[in-house]
From Swiss-Prot:
Quaternary assembly: Homodimer; disulfide-linked. Interacts with IL5RA. Interacts with CSF2RB.
Protein name per UniProt: Interleukin-5
A UniProt-annotated Pfam family: IL5
Glycosylation sites: 48, 77, 91
Principal subcellular localisation of the protein: secreted
Subcellular location: Secreted
Alphabetical keyword list: Cytokine, Disulfide bond, Glycoprotein, Growth factor, Secreted, Signal
Organism placement in taxonomy: Eukaryota, Metazoa, Chordata, Craniata, Vertebrata
Secretion signal, residue range per the UniProt entry: 1-19
InterPro entries: 4_helix_cytokine-like_core, IL-5
Record's keyword annotation contains Disulfide bond: yes
Annotated function: Homodimeric cytokine expressed predominantly by T-lymphocytes and NK cells that plays an important role in the survival, differentiation, and chemotaxis of eosinophils. Also acts on activated and resting B-cells to induce immunoglobulin production, growth, and differentiation. Mechanistically, exerts its biological effects through a receptor composed of IL5RA subunit and the cytokine receptor common subunit beta/CSF2RB.
Gene that encodes the chain: IL5
Gene3D superfamilies in the record: 1.20.1250.10
Length: 135
């Protein structure tokens, strides 16, 4: 019985480990497809020259996610939808859902100071290496 339980836990762990890269690979594939669709249909999307959409002033895209998706909604509502554009906006919606699910993890449980400091150090390292620091 104990061996069966251990095998079950081992199988569950293997499923979890395999699911994470698959989800990440799926998201990467979705983003690549969306970039291709955006590039392909850019002219069609630019059709409404009078439409104005807010564009964040700085390049730290992580800080402007809400503004980016508000712009996507504006563009979607003001653009004549065809099948190709429907796929583009559907992909963008799926990407937003993924980001929203990830944001829910921000309010995790309280932990010890050392764990917070480790997280803070990692956060600052990301800012230092991946973000465009503006003056």
């Amino acid at each position: 019985m104990r061996v069966l339980l251990q095998l079950g836990l081992l199988a569950l762990g293997a499923v979890c480990v395999c699911a994470i890269p698959k989800q990440s690979a799926t998201l990467r594939a979705l983003v690549r497809e969306t970039l291709t669709l955006l590039s392909t249909h850019r002219t069609l999307l630019k059709g409404n020259e009078t439409l104005r959409i807010s564009v964040p002033a700085h390049k730290n895209h992580q800080l402007c996610i809400e503004e980016i998706f508000q712009g996507i909604d504006t563009l979607k509502n003001q653009t004549t939808q065809g099948e190709a554009l429907a796929t583009l906006f559907q992909n963008l919606s799926l990407i937003k859902k993924h980001i929203d699910l990830q944001k829910q993890k921000c309010g995790e449980e309280r932990r010890r100071v050392k764990q917070f400091l480790d997280y803070l150090q990692e956060f600052l390292a990301v800012i230092n290496t991946e973000w465009t620091i503006e003056g």
